[in-house]
């Protein structure tokens, strides 16, 4: 699992490491060496590298990267966006080292648009070291808009240092325009902005590099889930039977949406449930019976569903919601299953019903998982979607903690919030899942 941090957390860790005795200039040199190694991947010794450097410490990283690559005998050009006097102290130190290495930088303000574009087109790779992850939340000036648009328009592959310039490091929103990188080198840890909102469309491949920054007491419970983190399926003993692996009730599907019932019941069986029963309105029982494999039981229900059918069975897990429709009053049923001990998963129309009886979330006994997309979560919280996207980690974590549940907020990097405050980013999303039925 790769650790994920916010820019604020990263700054605190950075400051703590410096306070503990590691000079900031030494950290910058380590970061530059690690980045230079990755920038050089796939390049020949004759391929030109153009490093575009801002005036902050991200630009200082870029100046050091350029010096290291040039020392290897590679053709390197440096384009600075500001004069030396506007640079941070560490950047000024690396600017001086660059001059000592007999590398003369170019300055963006002294070149024509055509000259800048020719510089970009003539490179094998551009290194974006203009802005770091602490970029203020305000539109970029016209100067930087032109610079970034020129980088993107050149068609030259771009490697961004820490985060693409123009992308907010906290929530992954662009500030009007952003570098579109084919690769982003994350210093020490991946920043949240690389994975949230627009981040994945601008960061390309994300490669973290360890430069020895310590956490210094900063508690971080965010991680990017990878294949080796998922221990599934678990080994099974030979002397077992169907009830060893649990009985699942799938309450999904209704007139016009019977497919939801099929998808949910099949999914429950495929993950290894010992016994799956698909509950469906009486008029759809024959349809499900024909569509589902024979090992899945179909239980028809009518208006007496809650009293006569469901209470008579004990379930190891209950799935409720996809395609159940909005014409039946499921309030009493929700209260019943949430007062029980069996884990409950609620999705889709089930969340719509939950909105109308939110009081059942208070003090619920059953372990609970909610799986909304952004629109459904907006309705659950009463907050507009735009507000949520500006701070999804805080809002999602608070909701999961306050209601003692697991929140699975679906998206490209689906966010999983635990009631204890941990946050996991799913790494397997893809735009092909943007179709009806993926949630089911």
Question: Language-model segments: which ranges?
Answer:
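Short, structured secondary-structure boundary patches
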Residues: 96-103, 128-132, 296-302, 429-432
């Amino acid at each position: 699992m790769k650790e994920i941090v916010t820019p604020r957390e990263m700054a605190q860790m950075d400051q703590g490491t410096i306070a503990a005795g590691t000079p900031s200039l030494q950290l910058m040199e380590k970061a530059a060496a690690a980045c230079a190694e990755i920038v050089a991947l796939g390049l020949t010794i004759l391929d030109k590298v153009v490093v575009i450097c801002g005036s902050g410490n991200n630009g200082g990283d870029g100046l050091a990267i350029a010096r290291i690559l040039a020392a290897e005998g590679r053709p390197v050009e440096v384009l600075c966006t500001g004069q030396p006097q506007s640079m941070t102290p560490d950047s000024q130190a690396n600017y001086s080292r660059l001059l000592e290495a007999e590398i003369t930088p170019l300055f963006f303000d002294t070149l024509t648009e055509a000259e800048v574009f020719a510089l970009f087109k003539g490179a094998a790779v551009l290194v974006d070291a203009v802005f770091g992850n602490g970029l203020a939340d305000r539109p970029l000036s016209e100067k930087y808009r032109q610079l970034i648009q020129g980088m993107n328009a050149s068609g030259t592959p771009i490697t961004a240092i820490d985060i693409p310039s123009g992308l907010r490091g906290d929530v992954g929103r662009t500030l009007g325009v952003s570098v579109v990188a084919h690769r982003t080198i994350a210093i020490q840890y991946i920043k949240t902005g690389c994975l949230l909102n627009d981040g994945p469309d601008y960061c390309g491949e994300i490669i973290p590099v360890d430069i020895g920054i310590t956490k210094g007491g900063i508690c971080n419970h965010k991680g990017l889930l990878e294949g080796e983190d998922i221990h599934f399926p678990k080994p099974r003993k030979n002397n077992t039977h169907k009830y060893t692996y649990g009985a699942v009730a799938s309450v999904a599907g209704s007139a016009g949406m019977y497919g939801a019932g099929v998808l949910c019941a099949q999914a429950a069986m495929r993950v290894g449930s010992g016994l799956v029963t698909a509950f469906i309105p009486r008029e759809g029982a024959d349809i499900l019976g024909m569509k589902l494999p024979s090992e899945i039981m179909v239980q028809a229900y009518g208006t007496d569903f809650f009293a006569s059918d469901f209470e008579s069975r004990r379930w190891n897990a209950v799935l409720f919601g996809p395609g159940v429709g909005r014409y039946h009053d499921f309030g009493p049923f929700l209260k019943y299953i949430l007062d029980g001990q069996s884990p409950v998963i609620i999705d889709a129309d089930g969340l719509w019903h939950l909105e109308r009886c939110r009081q059942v979330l208070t003090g619920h006994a059953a372990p609970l998982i909610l799986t909304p997309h952004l629109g459904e979560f907006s309705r659950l919280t009463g907050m507009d979607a735009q507000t949520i996207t500006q701070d999804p980690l805080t809002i999602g974590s608070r909701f999961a903690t306050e209601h003692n549940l697991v929140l699975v907020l679906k998206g490209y990097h689906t966010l999983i919030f635990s009631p204890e405050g941990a946050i996991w980013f799913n790494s397997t999303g893809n735009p092909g899942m943007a179709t009806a039925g993926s949630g089911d």
